[in-house]
C-alpha cells in the first residue's frame, strides 16, 4: 500500500496531495526557469525534513558552503526570527541575530551536512561528490540528499557526450537512492530558454 510507505512530506499540502511527498529510494527532479525559486524550494524541503526528524545533505555548485548555509538559515529561522536593518545606502536588509543563529546551529548539529565544493579539484568532483554522499548516508544516516544542480555537479563540457553523461550521473544517483533507501532531490535547468518546456527539455531527464 503506497499510502503506508514512509516518506518526507514537503510541507505544502497541495503538492503532497499530488505527489504524495518525497519517497525513499527515489530521485525527484526539480526544474523550472532561472530565478523561479528552485534553490529556495530545495532549502525549504531540507528544513521540512529536519523538522520531521530526518538528517539531510546538500551540494550546491553555485554557492559556497557558507553562502548556502546562510540561505538555509533564513528558511529555518522563519519570518518571526528575521530582523531588518538599513545599510549605508538607505536600503533595507535582512539579518538573523546571533542568539537565533546559535539556536539554529544547535538544531542542525549532527543532522545537517553541506558539501564543501572547494575541497577537491574539478576533475575529481563528480566521483568525489558521489563518494561523499554514500559515506555520509552510511555513517550518519542521512535520509534526504539535495543536489543543486545537475550541470555544476558534473565536469563534462557542452558536447555530444553531455546528455549521456547526465543520464549516467542520474542513474548512479538512482542506484544510490535504492541501495540506501534515501530520498534524492536533483535540481536541473531546462536545456532551452522559452515560455514552456517538456520533459525532453530538462537536462538529465
Segments predicted by a language model, with ranges:
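The Walker A/P-loop phosphate-binding site
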Residues: 1-80
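Phosphate-binding/switch region of NTP-binding enzymes
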Residues: 14, 18, 35, 61, ...
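Non-membrane alpha-helical structural segments and their capping/turn regions in soluble enzymes
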Residues: 39-40, 126-127, 160-167, 171
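Conserved inter-motif catalytic segment of the P-loop NTP-binding fold
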Residues: 54-159
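Aromatic/hydrophobic pocket-lining residues that form π-stacking "cages" and hydrophobic walls in ligand
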Residues: 45, 133, 173
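Short, basic, glycine/proline-bearing loop/turn elements
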Residues: 3, 28-32, 111-119, 159, ...
Amino acid at each position: 500500500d503506497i499510502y503506508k510507505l514512509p516518506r518526507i512530506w514537503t510541507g505544502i499540502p497541495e503538492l503532497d496531495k499530488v505527489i504524495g511527498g518525497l519517497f525513499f529510494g527515489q530521485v525527484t527532479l526539480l526544474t523550472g526557469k532561472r530565478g523561479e525559486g528552485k534553490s529556495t524550494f530545495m532549502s525549504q524541503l531540507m528544513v521540512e525534513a529536519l523538522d520531521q526528524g530526518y538528517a539531510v545533505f546538500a551540494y550546491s555548485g553555485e554557492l559556497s558552503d557558507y553562502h548556502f548555509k546562510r540561505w538555509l538559515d533564513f528558511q529555518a529561522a522563519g519570518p518571526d526570527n528575521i530582523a531588518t536593518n538599513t545599510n549605508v545606502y538607505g536600503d533595507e536588509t535582512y539579518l538573523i541575530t546571533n542568539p537565533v543563529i546559535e539556536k539554529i546551529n544547535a538544531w542542525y548539529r549532527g543532522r545537517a551536512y553541506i558539501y564543501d565544493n572547494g575541497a577537491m579539484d574539478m576533475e575529481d568532483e563528480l566521483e568525489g561528490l558521489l563518494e561523499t554522499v554514500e559515506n555520509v548516508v552510511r555513517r550518519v544516516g542521512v535520509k534526504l540528499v539535495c543536489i543543486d544542480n545537475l550541470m555544476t555537479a558534473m565536469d563534462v563540457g557542452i558536447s555530444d557526450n553531455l546528455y549521456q553523461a547526465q543520464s549516467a550521473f542520474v542513474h548512479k544517483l538512482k542506484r544510490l537512492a535504492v541501495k540506501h533507501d534515501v530520498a534524492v532531490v536533483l535540481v536541473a535547468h531546462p536545456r532551452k530558454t522559452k515560455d514552456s518546456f517538456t520533459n525532453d527539455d530538462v537536462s538529465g531527464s
